[in-house]
Each structure stands twice: as structure tokens, then as C-alpha cells.
Amino acid sequence: MVLTNVKQFASEMNLTPERLLEQLRAAGVSKRSPEDSLSAQDKSQLLDYLKRSHGAREDSGITLTRKSTSEVKKADGSTVTVETRKKRVVVRPDDAPRAEAPKPAEPAPAPAAAPAEAKPEPKPEPKVEAKPEPKPEPKPEPKVEAKPEPKPEPKPAAAPAPRTVASILSPEEIAAREAEEKRQAAFRARQEALMREKIEREERRQAAKLAASQPAPEPAPVVEPQREERRDDRRGAPSGDNRGPRGNDNRGPRPAGAGDRGPRPGGDNRGPRPAGAGDRGPRPGGDNRGPRPAGAGDRGPRPAPAAAAPSQPPAPAPGGSRPGKGKKGGERSWDDNKKGGRGLKTKGGDAGNDWKSRGGKGRNKQNNQHAFQAPTEPIVHEVLVPETITVAELAHKMAVKAVEVIKTLMKMGMMVTINQVLDQETALIVVEEMGHIGKAAQADDPEAYLDVTDGETVEVVEQPRSPVVTVMGHVDHGKTSLLDYIRRAKVAAGEAGGITQHIGAYHVETPRGMITFLDTPGHEAFTAMRARGAKATDIVVLVVAADDGVMPQTIEAIHHAKAAKVPMVVAVNKIDKQGANVERIRQELVAHEVVPEDWGGDTQFVEVSAKMGLNIDALLEAILLQAEVLELKAPVDSLAKGIIVEARLDKGRGPVATLLVQSGTLKKGDVVLAGTAFGRVRAMMDENGKAIDSAGPAIPVEILGLSDVPQAGEDAMALADEKKAREIALFRAGKFRDVRLAKQQAAKLENMFAQMAEGEVQTLSIIIKADVQGSYEALAGSLQKLSTEEVRVAILHSGVGGISESDVNLAIASKAIVIGFNTRADAAARKLAENEGVDIRYYNIIYDAVDEVKAALSGMLAPEKKEQILGTVEIRQVITVSKVGNIAGCMVTDGMIKRSASIRLIRNHVVIHTGELESLKRFKDDVKEVKQGYECGLMLKNFNDIQEGDQLEAFEIVEVARSL
């Protein structure tokens, strides 16, 4: 029998060992530590306890599975075996569901309780023939009263949810969900209260108007009997009103009369109704029930009596034409049914205000002229707008039709489609235009997701941590030698050759504490890290050679440290060499506002020798002293946060990232998010390549398991939810891709006219593959700085890892050069490159790559043309030959003259003509050149105006290669 311990079983069940121990104790299994073993009996006992606690029950069904095999013959004579599987579930009859069946009927009397109380009131109902009241009247009434009721109903349904998911969600998450539901319920209740208050205010205002001007409804009795007859003939409805009780508002029976039904004699005090059964006006009394919903008769809002009384026309003759039907629907328009609401169109009354009424549409317009309109104020939504959103998604968030959003955008001058993507700024303007509240959503901010667990992390006690030190300085000032000596002196003997295991950061144990040294790829990477606001470096050690002094890169390092507001410790190296002048270095550093403590400043100066090992302990002591002043602290028992120092692509292990933990503890199995890369930590190693399970603050580690190679200097953090990490990473990748494409498009548009004006720019396309991410970044930046107005370097692709066949194919398509920095091409890539003639160059030093690319760009520059004077010729005799022209007999007085040279004719020190030679002869022979002191005969091309004494200057145009 295989035994497992509590810790292993907890990891299988996705529980913490402490939680599993609590459940085991509650089940009666005595286990004290996560290392205790668990038997099958213990697991069975725990399972029985969990079933009892969660209310498990026996299966009430039997599953029958039937399988049959048959063969089907095809046309070609072959057979195909067909297997048919049938599955049937037989449910065992159970008494429990029958007993529980009547329970859902209990809430039913609740909504009917209100009408039940009003049953004694409508007893005099048979005396009154309320024929104008259509039967659909009870339908709108429950709609108004039932609107708020379904909203509280989900609350009891949500009660059992914590019991069913208690084993999955923590109590804090359940409490957060319940708080969110309460907040939503309060928000809905507040909106309903505001709407009711608005309706009541409108009704009170309308009631005041009705009370001020209340005409006598005299024409009503004349019209109503005929309407009664027509309605009865049309509907065939019984004369009695069998609609049942109206509610608990203590209204008395209605008097006879279909149109003007008069005041209710009950205690309703609502004043007289206006004429017209189909379109009943508002209740002028104190009945604050809100507007009637459009029912079967499409009665809509009740108009004011002042408008209703004059609008009654004389009764039409039985056989005569009805008003409003003289033309073929001539009175109808698009606005006919707008004022009566958008209810269901059914057969209405004859009062002239229904869509099928016989009174014509003209009266309908008069009736509704001063009618009370139902409040149409929309519910204000709080819309979270991401960085990009489509028109359809934006309309869905505002609970409106997409057509309305498109109309709003058209008013703003934008012609869009329903699937067009809007940017965040435009979407926020649209939301505000449509009367809603727009807020910019921070969907890609992990801090917003971690706000839920802030209550846990705030209480974590911060503990002192070791300092993170960056060593900076000029190239040849002994920075690397100093780091090597510190590792050799303070690390175990077996790690003496640990420089080859370079991961960019390592920590050193000293008698007074631990120090983490950070070796950034260069100053630019250091600035980029500081610009992101990540406090990766606590102290900067500035290395200055005593025999060389302050150099440009030293000054640059000082500026970086001051911009980041990081304290400095100056290490004056090479003090054992002759010619070392420490005092001169102090004076030069003071000129750059780095004042030593001896001179009243705040910067420690330590004189060291990396070669001899002098004062190395004093340097470490100064670093730890500065760290004590800073009081560096960080939480330990929380999710880890850190920064990516370096990243590379390992052929066997995939993406490998060097992570410097800044706060919290990173454990094996945590989900890490770094920019657009995410993944679960499959393995962790320290700087010596040893596998570790956890790393605390200020500890550098190599992690494996990320989905892609992250950017150097990117912030990294551990998340509790892998799904959320994937969502954020994919969102960032899509956003970065959109931004990159937008930038490229903008650059094309901006540079289009400039390139057309300046002519075509020569472009050198390059593909860079490097060993680590920092290397190709530095190389790409250095090469792009070589671009000028005439030649340009285009980095088509850059990445980490070896040169693959896909890289060579890209180079073939784009006619690019492939540069491998500390990498090599595989066999397939080499063979393809040889066959296609792709140039692959390998470099180990960045300066060699920059120099060769610079030389290639220089060759692409247009050569510079210069004029080189060859010699001077004096014309001593002019011979005229018919059909040939003038021939000059000359003497070469200086230099030489060539047959291919250009000629400049000078007369009286003035240039008369510039051209070419047509022929050059010495005696009767054609010659290519004539040197100084010899005579020759020559003839100019297309020019005969030559005289004795003229000077001829021979010159040629020479192209001189340019360089960057």
C-alpha cells in the first residue's frame, strides 16, 4: 500500500497543508505536521466527513450502457466496422422530490395578497357596467408592481452558493462577493428610488395644473353611448366587467359611462377622468402609482382634461364617413404612435387616440398635445472603457443599440461601422455624450487585480534585507577585476571559476551580512531600469583608476546615479601602480559634485587594489555601512515582486530569465508575470547552478518555465491566479502589437513626403541573433545610431538563440545580412545560406560588428566627385582644314594631356569653353596621352573658335569614396 504524507496529499487537492490538517482534525484523524503519513483509511475517513458536512446524498439513478458492433459493406466490397454505443439513465423514484414539490408554490400567494385584500370593496361591481375597461387592464398592473420584486429574489438564491463552493473559495473571497452583491442591490434600490421620486414629482406638478384649470366635461355624455355600442359590436365582449379586484387603493365602484367615467366614489380623491376610454389621463389625486404601461388598448399616459374636453367631435352618422378617412391614410405620419408609447398594437377604442381608432388622427394629435409623458430618463451606467473597444461592445456596455452609438459618432464627424475599433479617448467622449459615466479601465494593471488581497499583504511585517550594489566605471579601470577578486575572496573555493556561470547578478556572504552585486549590461540598461521606477539598485560603487583619472564614462555613471538618486561609494583602484595620484582624482570628482567625506561631503572614498587585494574588506565595510544608513527593508511572507536582470533562450531549457527578487518570497511553482511573458516556475537555480526551492528579497535567481523571453529591466511579479496572468500577458501582447503597428504606420506617413523630396534612401537590412537579450539590444542600438540621411540601418528582426532556418528565409526574402553575436547557425540554416548566397557573419565583440557594419554603410554612400587637373597646353598654331575644322598645334607646358580628359579653353584668363577632345595626335599617329615638353595636334569636339595664344587646361573627374 502506497503511503503519502499530508503535504503531498494537500498539493494534489490544491489545498494548503494547514487547511488539510484542520479538515483531518475535524474528521477525527490526528495528524500534527505536514510530514505525517496518510493511509487509505485516513483518506476514507476524511471523505466521509466531507460528505457529511456538505450534505452528500446517494445517487438516485442507474446508468445503463449498451454497445453493439456491426459491419457496413462499401461499394468497393470493403467492410467498415461500426460500433454503436447507447447510454440510458434510469431515475429511481424518490419520495423526497414529491415532498419538496409543493414548496415552490408558497411564494405564489405573496404577489396575490394585495388583490386579495381588496375583494370586499368591489361588491357593488355588478351595478356598474364598466364596458370601456378592456380585459388587458390587469396585465399592466402586475407589471408595475412586480418590477422591484424579482430584484430581491436572487438574494435567497445566492445564500446556498457559499455552502457549495466553500471548499473552493476562501472566506475572504466569499465575503468580497457578498459585499459586491449588496453594493449592486443598494445601487439598484437607489436608482429605483430616484425614478419613483421623479414620477411622483411629475404627477404632483400635473395634478396642480389639472386643479388650476378643470373644465366641465359636458360633451362627453353625448359621445359616449355611441362609442359603447361600437365597441360592443366590434369586440363582442360581455357587458359585465369581470376583471376582478383592482388593488388595495380603496377605490369605489365606477359609475356608468364608458368615456367619462367620473370620479370614483371611494376614498381615492382622484378627480374626474378626461373623456376617452382608450387614452386615460393621469390621476390628478394623490395616487402616486406612476404611469400606466401600454396595455392591450394602448391607452398610454392619461391626457389633461383641458385638452381632452374640446377635442370631442360630434358623433358621426352611422352610415356616414368617419373623420380622418377622407384620404387614404393621408393624416398618418411617422409620429402617429410615438406619443402613445411603444406598447403592443392591439384593437383599441374609438376615442381617436389608438392606432386603429375611428376618430381620425387629427384628434389624436390634439389629445396628446398636453398629455403627461412617461419619464424616459435612462439609467445612468458606469462604463469601464479599455484602451481599445469596438462599437458593438461599447453599445452593449451602455445597454443601447449600436445604431445609437453610430449616430452619436456621426454627429461627431466620424463615419464608423459596428465592428470598428475605437480608441479609449474617443469611446470616453461617446459615453459622456450619451449621458453615461465613462471611466478608463486599467485592465492590464496587475496592481488592480492584487487590490483584492491587499488586506493580507498590508499586515506583513517588513524585515531587513541585504543591499543591491551596482558596480560602474570606465572600461579599463578594473571593474571586472574587482568583482572577480570579491568572488574569489568571499565565495567557496569550488566557485572560483564562477565567472563563466554569469547570470548578471550574484550575492556574497560577509561576516557582517550579505551583499548582492548587480552586473547590468551597460549604462543604457541601467537608465531604463531606473526610468521604470523599479528600485533595483540601492548603492552604486564607482570605480576610478588612480593612474587614469576621471573619464567620460565615469562622468556618465555619475549622472546616472544622481538621476536615480542612489548613494555612491567611490573605489579608487590601481593604487599599487606607479603614477597613481589619488588627490587628483578627488579634485576631478569634486568638480562633478562628488565630494568625499574628508572634505565635508557625503561620499565615501576607499582606496583599493583589485590585483593585490588591498582594502577589499574596507570596501565591503563601506557598502554595508551605507546600507545601514538606508535601513533597507522588505516584506518576506508575501507574493514575490522583482525585476528581470537578463534573459536568454536556452536550446534545451527554453526561455531562462534572471530575476532579482525585491520583495516577498518566490517559490517553486509560483505563477510569474513579466511583461508579455508568463508561466509557472518549473525550476529555480542560484548563480552557481544549484537548484533551490525559494528565494527571498535581494536574492538573484534563474527561473525556467516562462512562455517567452521577457525584456531586460521588465517588472516581474508572482500572481495567485494563472488564468489572470495569461489574460494580462495576452492583453499586453496585443496592446504592444497595436502600438507598434500604429507607430510604424505613423512613421511611414510622416516620412513619405520627406523620402519623396530627398530621393530614395539606401537601406542596409540586418537580422541580429544574440546569446542574451541585453546583447542584441545593445548591438541594435549601436547599429541604428550609424544611420544618416543617405544610408539607413533597418533591424528587421532581433532575438535570442541560434540562427535558424526561418531567419535565413527571412534574409532571403528581404536581402538582409544575418549577424550572429556569440551564437552559431545550425546545419540546416548553414546549408540554406550557402545555396542562396545569404551572408552570415559571426562576432564575439560588439565593436567588431559595429566597425564592419559601418564600413558596409560607407560603401553604400554615393561617392564624392572631385576635379583633378592633369596639365596645361598652349596653342601655338591654328590650322584650318576644309570639311574638318580648325586643328590646334600645341605644346604641353605643364603636366600631361590625355585623350579621355576634359578640356577647358582659357583666353585672357577667362574661361571661354569647356568640353572634350575629339582627337589627339602626335605627328600622324593617334595617341592616348602626351607628356610635358612634347608637341601635339588636337581638335575640340563641336568647337572651332580657337586662336593662337589660347591656353587649354586638361582635367578629369575623380570619384572619391566617402566614409561615415
Swiss-Prot record:
Sequence segments annotated as region (G4): 573-576
A Gene Ontology term for the protein's cellular component: cytosol
Superkingdom of source: Bacteria
Region of interest (Disordered), residue spans: 26-375
Residue ranges of the region described as G3: 519-522
Record function comment: One of the essential components for the initiation of protein synthesis. Protects formylmethionyl-tRNA from spontaneous hydrolysis and promotes its binding to the 30S ribosomal subunits. Also involved in the hydrolysis of GTP during the formation of the 70S ribosomal complex.
Name this protein carries in UniProt: Translation initiation factor IF-2
Originating organism: Chromobacterium violaceum (strain ATCC 12472 / DSM 30191 / JCM 1249 / CCUG 213 / NBRC 12614 / NCIMB 9131 / NCTC 9757 / MK)
Name of the gene this protein is made from: infB
